[in-house]
Amino acid sequence: MSESAFAERIVHNLLDTDFYKLTMMQGVLHNYPDADVEWEFRCRNGEDLRPYLGEIRNQLERLNDLTLDDGQLPFLERISFLKPDFLRFLRLFRFNLRYVRVGIENDQLFLRLKGPWLHVILFEVPLLAIISEVRNRQLHPHMRLAEARDQLYRKFDWLRAHASDEELAELQVADFGTRRRFSSRVQEEVVRVLRDDFPARFVGTSNVDLAWKLDIKPLGTMAHEWIMAHQQLGPRLIDSQIAALDCWVREYRGLLGIALTDCITMDAFLGDFDLYFAKLFDGLRHDSGEPVAWAEKAIAHYQKLGIDPMTKTLVFSDGLNLTRSLEIFRALRGRINVSFGIGTNLTCDIPGVAPMSIVLKMTDCNGAPVAKISDEAAKTQCRDENFVAYMRHVFKVPSKE
């Protein structure tokens, strides 16, 4: 019989997280070690998660004893932009559960983080992975790894049947599926199969532990929280995106050069993404809105600045599958470089399983609200409607209501 899809422990070491958490954490250590933040959990589809509270708490408490393994340190030391002082800090880092509140509120599971950004930043990914896997264990206790593996091979067959050899040689796909994975075992199996048998180009994973374990490239630069936090880190609101990008440039000196565009909107982002940033950053990441229309804006912006789009890369990561990735690839092929980060559709696509729609987002920085407006109304997030209205006014973003 095939192996179970579940291990006894859900998060088994400190690096079972997304790579951009480490890159942002280093930026926080060097630039904002005293910043305080708040985060709030949301289940977008209203699923009742109250029955899972006890096991969620149990798995959460087990984060206490996670540390950086000695065997993992040489792997991180080979990544040139992770500095020795940050790795020393990471070696000493421990999750502190006094920054976490979890319980029932208004007949729903609630989860809040409040504390120093430097000590809270690593909670997001393992907490979401815990909630997802605890729920999946309860609903699908007899799931076997073979069911996830077979589904993945069916996708490979589809891709071979619908893409030419030339397209397969150029189509780049990465695993971005940690936070809403079916289980840790399923993600590891999926990434292993992608590494060994993917018919196109498998370029890496966002999961640092799997990158270390399977000898593949860890991928990621920045998340929304990096830009959102800068709304309350000192500069005028109108200058917050510029401050976030400038701080990133100073931290990484041209490395990790994929910028996220939809914290406010693509139009607002491009207003700040001048020739200086357009030359320094290697490309842009799409995470909301219609992807090809977004790409056309990016291409036009580069051309307006006198930059050849074929020297830049667009990374797509918004709810993708292989079918949609191939469509986008074909629409943009030969005009700009593209790459695709696929999450839930790789790590939680099993017949009979409905993946979760859960997020854990920053709501406050230094005691004041932060917001993500995005290029998709459903992804707008802020606890303070007045702040969202003010941000729309400052960046001249029309209401989507």
Curated annotation (Swiss-Prot):
Keyword Methyltransferase (UniProt): no
UniProt-listed GO biological process terms: NAD biosynthetic process via the salvage pathway
GO-annotated molecular function: nicotinate phosphoribosyltransferase activity
Reaction(s) catalysed by this chain's protein: nicotinate + 5-phospho-alpha-D-ribose 1-diphosphate + ATP + H2O = nicotinate beta-D-ribonucleotide + ADP + phosphate + diphosphate
Record flagged with keyword Cell inner membrane: no
UniProt entry keywords in alphabetical sequence: Ligase, Phosphoprotein, Pyridine nucleotide biosynthesis
Post-translational modification remark: Transiently phosphorylated on a His residue during the reaction cycle. Phosphorylation strongly increases the affinity for substrates and increases the rate of nicotinate D-ribonucleotide production. Dephosphorylation regenerates the low-affinity form of the enzyme, leading to product release.
Residues recorded with modification Phosphohistidine: 224
GO cellular component annotations of the record: cytosol
EC number: 6.3.4.21
Family listed: Belongs to the NAPRTase family.
HAMAP family hit by this protein: NAPRTase
Function: Catalyzes the synthesis of beta-nicotinate D-ribonucleotide from nicotinate and 5-phospho-D-ribose 1-phosphate at the expense of ATP.
PANTHER family per the UniProt record, alphabetical: NICOTINATE PHOSPHORIBOSYLTRANSFERASE
Protein name as annotated: Nicotinate phosphoribosyltransferase
Native organism taxonomy: Bacteria, Pseudomonadati, Pseudomonadota, Gammaproteobacteria, Pseudomonadales
